[in-house]
């Protein structure tokens, strides 16, 4: 019975091939490697193990029919997905701890963006797992349905998956760009607030120095000038520290943006390669079934063809 289900899947994939060629690009081998060096984060290593398992599934040959129809693949992907999301959560908490000295508004915004990125990654991985489970369920139920209906539904699923990954990646890039601009504006506002706060003190010190100089003479004026210069130096030091903090924040944002963009591109390319690999697995079976079907139709037509009858003889 499993062999018959696989044969029906092959026929549907063959019918969907023409529709998918218009949506997907040329086939690309799934060779992208996740970062595994000492500098990579634990959540990146967990995500790499997730993709390693997907690559292992794609290397199956003779056992691929049975593996696609049982629940072992779904269970393994679920375990790897939970491990990855656990590492992502730990990394997010670590980043939130490092952002303690930042303003409360900026810290809340960073936490919100990190949660959005975490949710997006989890949603994409969950969608991949559910897609495999859905294919398995539809294969088990397709014997009582219309072939054209299943072919159209499967073609729609295979077209929407790359588009969805691209849309998610673009949306995440836009969110990070907006956050980066907002963080820069917030840091600039903080510097402006510092200037506004210490500016009146400097002016007040200058005014007091001028007043004291008129009352106490030149020595007191020199002391006031020294005090003013000292206060001005402290103000400049505070400004430099704030600027350094802003530069560090911008650098961290650029690193996060680059990592998210790289992960989005990798997920899109690997999803497309995985779908193309599925088609390549079943192409020999499709051709063999088409030849067998053509031979069967020809035999049936020959069997049902009426034999010619001899015409009646004429009596002269």
Curated annotation (Swiss-Prot):
Residues 157-167 are annotated as: LDL and other lipoprotein receptors binding. Residues 277-289 are annotated as: Specificity for association with VLDL. GO terms for cellular component: chylomicron; extracellular exosome; extracellular matrix; extracellular space; extracellular vesicle; high-density lipoprotein particle; intermediate-density lipoprotein particle; low-density lipoprotein particle. Residues 209-289 are annotated as: Lipid-binding and lipoprotein association. Sequence repeats lie at residues 79-100, 101-122, 123-144, 145-166, 167-188, 189-210, 211-232, 233-254. Heparin binds at residues 161-164, 228-235. Its main location: secreted. The keyword Flavoprotein does not apply. The modification Methionine sulfoxide is found at residue 142. Glycans are attached at residues 32, 211, 309-310. It holds the Pfam family Apolipoprotein. APOE is an apolipoprotein, a protein associating with lipid particles, that mainly functions in lipoprotein-mediated lipid transport between organs via the plasma and interstitial fluids. APOE is a core component of plasma lipoproteins and is involved in their production, conversion and clearance. Apolipoproteins are amphipathic molecules that interact both with lipids of the lipoprotein particle core and the aqueous environment of the plasma. This is Apolipoprotein E. The gene is APOE.
């Amino acid at each position: 019975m499993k062999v018959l289900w696989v044969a029906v899947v092959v026929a549907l994939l063959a019918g969907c091939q023409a529709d998918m060629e218009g949506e997907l690009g040329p086939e690309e081998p799934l060779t992208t490697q996740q970062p595994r060096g000492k500098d990579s984060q634990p959540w990146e290593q967990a995500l790499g193990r997730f993709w390693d398992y997907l690559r292992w599934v794609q290397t199956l040959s003779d056992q691929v029919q049975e593996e696609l129809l049982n629940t072992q693949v779904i269970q393994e992907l679920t375990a790897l997905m939970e491990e990855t999301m656990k590492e992502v959560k730990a990394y997010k908490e670590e980043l939130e701890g490092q952002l303690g000295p930042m303003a409360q508004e900026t810290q809340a915004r960073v936490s919100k963006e990190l949660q959005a990125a975490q949710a997006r990654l989890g949603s994409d991985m969950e969608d991949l797992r559910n897609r495999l489970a859905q294919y398995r369920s539809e294969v088990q139920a397709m014997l009582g349905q219309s072939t054209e209906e299943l072919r159209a539904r499967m073609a729609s699923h295979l077209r929407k998956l790359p588009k969805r990954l691209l849309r998610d990646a673009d949306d995440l890039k836009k969110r990070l760009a907006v956050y980066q601009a907002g963080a820069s504006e917030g840091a600039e506002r903080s510097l402006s607030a510092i200037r506004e706060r210490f500016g009146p003190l400097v002016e007040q010190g200058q005014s007091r120095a001028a007043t004291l100089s008129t009352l106490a003479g030149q020595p007191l004026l020199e002391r006031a000038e020294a005090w003013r210069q000292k206060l001005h130096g402290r103000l400049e030091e505070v400004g430099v520290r704030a600027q350094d903090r802003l530069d560090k924040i911008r650098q961290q944002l650029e690193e996060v943006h680059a990592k998210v963009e790289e992960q989005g591109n990798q997920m899109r390319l690997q999803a497309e390669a995985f779908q193309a690999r599925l088609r390549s697995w079943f192409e020999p079976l499709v051709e063999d079934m088409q030849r067998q079907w053509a031979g069967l139709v020809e035999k049936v037509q020959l069997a049902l063809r009426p034999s010619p009858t001899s015409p009646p003889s004429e009596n002269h």
